[in-house]
Amino acid sequence: MKLLVVSGGRHPYEESTPVLEGFLKGAGHNVTVTDDPSVLADSGAMGGYDALVFNTLRAGDTTLSDAEQNGMKDFISGGKGFICVHISGVVPETWQEYLEITGGGWVMGTSYHPPYGNYTVNVTQPGHPGVAGVSDFDTDDELYMGIDYQDGNDVYMTGTSEDGTWPWGGKDTFMAGGTFPLGWTRSYGDGKVF
């Protein structure tokens, strides 16, 4: 499969993107990585890819242009794939339709997470292709909370957190525990979002 990975933004992508690229190549994919999202506006170039992978933060001064947004929407809704990794789900204030594409995303000023720590990832649909051969596992990561989830997501993986009070935004903040979706698929037009 030919994959385009869009990287860059305010996060340590210089560390995570090479790991992601190695993983995807190791799985047999043909991978192109770019920090320049202008390719999204080039339908000819995008037509050469099977799926778009976002390992990027495109909000604030790095928000996609209207042409890039439209190119991305056309690519996905036209039947291609879109994989949104980690904080790539941040919903830009000026592009709320992104939430419809991703099915859920970090909302600046509303979403949060407890400190980086260990929690169990539960595979809720062992037969789902997104977790084929994977069983529950422990990980060290941030468990996102306060995410704006949309209807129509086919959730196959969750994480659980206890209630707690942690520093957030310069003050101690109560964070209600619960079970939160971590991985899902959904449709956007004729495309598949993962």
How should each PLM-predicted stretch be described?
Residues K2-P92:
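Helical hinge/lid and interdomain linker segments adjacent to catalytic or ligand-binding clefts
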Residues V5, L57-R58, G105-W106, P167-K171:
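Short secondary-structure boundary micro-motifs
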Residues A59-G133:
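A glycine-rich, often tryptophan-bearing local segment used as a flexible ligand/cofactor-contacting loop or short
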Residues T110-K192:
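Catalytic beta-strand/loop cores that center a nucleophilic Ser/Cys/Thr
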Residues M46-D50, Q96-E97, G152-T158:
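Conserved long hydrophobic alpha-helices within structured protein cores
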